[in-house]
Amino acid sequence: MLAIYKRELKSYFRSFIGFLFIAVTLFFLGLYFSVYNLMNGYPYFAYVVSSVTFLFMLTVPILTMRILAEEKRSKTDQLILTAPVSVGGIVMGKFLALLTIFAIPVAIICFYPLIMAQYGSVPMGEAYLSILAYFLFGMTAIAIGLFLSSVTESQVIAAVLTFLVLFLGYMMDSICSIISSTGNLLTKLLRCFDLYTCLLYTSPSPRDGLLS
């Protein structure tokens, strides 16, 4: 599993996909952080991470589209399967490589609440819980992308499927609101697939307070 992990991690940074993912993620997080927290003085970092959840729909499909689909297309998956490692170990090694790339920008934004604290009172517990929720949410999105990459040999199809599933999760709250009149049972079932609202509920309104 360790060999698979190292191989995948190196391949992502050699192809610059890893660098691109980190750069785009940090750019948008930094942009929202600068506008909401530094320029306007909102003390809640949760509002920043909940505002950039849309980014998963764009970055995760690109990050995960080749992770298993390329192996199937080039038939190298057959070679890997003959290696002295279980299928679960192969999948876990690839997943941990993806998770490591995602963990880099998450580790960097852990310093953002400390920067905010230099300008006023900041609810640190809430800030770091929101970062944890953001990380767990990213893990879920990456796991979805990894699974969908395993069902096709085409990287494009894998990326499109991942985008559609994440987009459906992003829109699920709106869909549930539209069809709520059809019955509570259907609405409750659909809300099981609502990937985004749980994170949005953790962030208070930016009008709830200012750094002072």
PLM feature spans:
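Alpha-helical transmembrane segments of multi-pass membrane proteins
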Residues: 10, 14, 70, 88-105, ...
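Hydrophobic alpha-helical transmembrane segments of multi-pass membrane transport/permease proteins
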Residues: 16-35, 51-63, 164-168
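Aromatic- and glycine-rich beta-strand/loop motifs that create alpha-glucan
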Residues: 1-18
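Transmembrane helix segments
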Residues: 32-35, 152-199
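Secretory targeting signals
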Residues: 29-36, 45-48, 55, 97-158, ...
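Single conserved hydrophobic/aromatic residue that forms the stacking wall/gate
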Residues: 201-204, 208-211
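Transmembrane helix boundary and interhelical loop/hinge segments in multi-pass membrane proteins
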Residues: 44-45, 63-81, 95
